[in-house]
Amino acid sequence: MLDFNTHDLSEHVGTLVDKAMEREADLLPPRAYLGASSLGEDCTRRLQFQYFNTPKDAGRHFPGRVLRVFARGHRVEDWMADWLRLAGFDLRARNEHGEQFGFTAVDGRMRGHADGVIVAGPSGFCYPMLWENKAVGTQTFRELRKKRLAASRPVYATQVALYQAYLGLHEHPALFTAICADDMAIYAERVNFDRGLAQRASDRAVNILRACDTAELLPRISTTPTHQTCRYCPWQDRCWSLPH
């Protein structure tokens, strides 16, 4: 007997899960700092909106499907950590106090939390080294293979450089890994410390915070709301409703 209700049931269950995840996300405390994971983004005004926890435009919150993608990324990170340990890497995800490796700067208003530190392991690597992992789609995975990290994903590269600088792990290349979520292929790259990139990102954070302290609204990235960065920004309407 054919089941003509499968689509309706899938939609119903999916909606229930979406709403539950969105409610849970709404209860999370807002960040009161600039995160290292976002300091490589193009638009400084967007980072100001993030820092102030400015309400997003109507309908621009993260839907349940996107929240599940984020959750998948955390699970994939745990799996990759287990696989690296299985391969002989002494990977530490927590420090001696049981806390995630991280740093704070500018009176706690700039922070970052690294995936881990590898302190020993197979030959051919220099220890200790920072470890950072991402779960990515096929297109991003291909771009990483073709262009490498700095050219294909500058936001990730900035994050790595900041962790190397502030965690004192700049002497040895970091190990950046990415897992293709579609076929679980692994990409790995040694990332040399980019001192200039880390310094520019730190200076940028200070400039953004100074502007926030003086109520200065930093310039938009573009002169038109149809710019690609603006189209995907959750504060697009708010930003472009302002006089400048």
Where do the protein language model's features map onto the residues?
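Metal-dependent nuclease catalytic regions and adjoining charged, substrate-binding loops involved
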Residues: 4-5, 143-157, 162-244
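Residues immediately flanking
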Residues: 133-135, 235
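Generic beta-sheet signal
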Residues: 94, 133, 177-179
